[in-house]
Amino acid sequence: MMNRIELNSLNAIIDGIFLQLRDSNLSESENLSRIQVEQWIHQYRAYLIKQDLDKGRDINPSYIQTLGPLHISKVSTCGVPNGFHYISDKELPKFIDLHFGTGLVAVKDMHGNLIQVGNETKAKYQTSRKYTCNDYIAYLKNNHLYLNGPGFLEYVEIEGILEDPTKAADCYDYDGPYPIPANMIPTLKNLIFSKELNIMLTVPTDNTNNSTNDVKQ
């Protein structure tokens, strides 16, 4: 049985863009690579999501991907009473930048318990307070996940909104659901056609094969 390709998969979105170009008899599509179109899709997905969330709206679950299990290592006890500093062994892919912070949505231990997400400053003060010094807190720094808290963690899971969704796993499924709501895909395609392909189509070339300089800039 053949694998079913999701209508909102990355392959389906790329194929749809090329199909529309061919249907429009645009010869420039012959020189356009799938890699370039894919990068535009990631770029405008991030743009649309940022535009949506910077208005203060709730995060659409369709935006979110899960990373992990992610191994973390104890690095020191300095500044963490009764606990440790942890750091992820691997560098994390880039999360989108939002007005209120990063696209890091949630961190969980392997039992599904939520770990508070903050920043480095908040983590520093939390570990010095009487009633919160034994609570875990996680934050991003230099593309790694850092955690402060008791010495019982080894793996965590992360939920977040990545700039490039294909970086969420070593083997991304191009035929699986792409992390964007289906109703946002037409807007994403229109942005690519208007902002990118029109630029390509107006590159100075003489396609009329005549002696006049009638190329539009």
PLM features per residue range, with description:
Residues 2-217:
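Glycine-enriched, solvent-exposed interface loops adjoining structured elements
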